[in-house]
């Protein structure tokens, strides 16, 4: 029993002093892993993994919009390209950047693909 408790206490100590996590979930999935399991042209609904990745990206883009609207009134129009185009861009980015992450693909969509709009800022 003692041999079990010592490693458990050591593990708890390591977790308690861990660095903060800034990005979690599917955004940390490596591009090589995604492209190995997502054939091009198959759409984001082909598996549980691809649906989870696309859902994470949509949530990331939506959260970016909320912060942008609150701070400056600026937001990305998520309808400026279709969901199929968004998915194709994610897969294409990952094929070109196998060492990248899903987060990187989402950031590139924001920077290069979605139309930016401006409305009234909601500073609070």
Question: What do these predicted ranges mean?
Answer:
Residues 21-92:
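Short N-proximal segments of mature Sec-exported proteins
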Residues 89, 93, 105-108:
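Charge-rich, solvent-exposed alpha-helical interaction surfaces
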Residues 98-124:
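C-terminal partner/receptor-binding element of secreted or periplasmic proteins
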Residues 16-20:
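Boundary at the C-terminal end of the N-terminal hydrophobic targeting segment
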Residues 14-15, 115:
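Contiguous, function-dense segments enriched for cysteine-driven chemistry
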């Amino acid at each position: 029993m003692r041999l079990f408790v010592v490693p458990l206490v050591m593990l708890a100590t390591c977790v308690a002093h861990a660095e903060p996590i800034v990005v979690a979930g599917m955004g940390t999935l490596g591009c090589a892993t995604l492209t190995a399991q997502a054939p091009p042209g198959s759409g984001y609904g082909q598996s549980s993994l691809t649906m989870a990745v696309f859902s994470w990206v949509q949530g990331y883009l939506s959260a970016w919009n909320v912060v942008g609207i609150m701070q400056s009134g600026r937001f990305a129009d998520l309808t400026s390209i279709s969901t199929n185009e968004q998915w194709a861009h994610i897969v294409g980015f990952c094929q070109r950047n196998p060492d990248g992450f899903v987060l990187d693909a989402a950031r590139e969509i924001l920077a290069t693909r979605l139309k930016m709009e401006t409305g009234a800022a909601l500073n609070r």
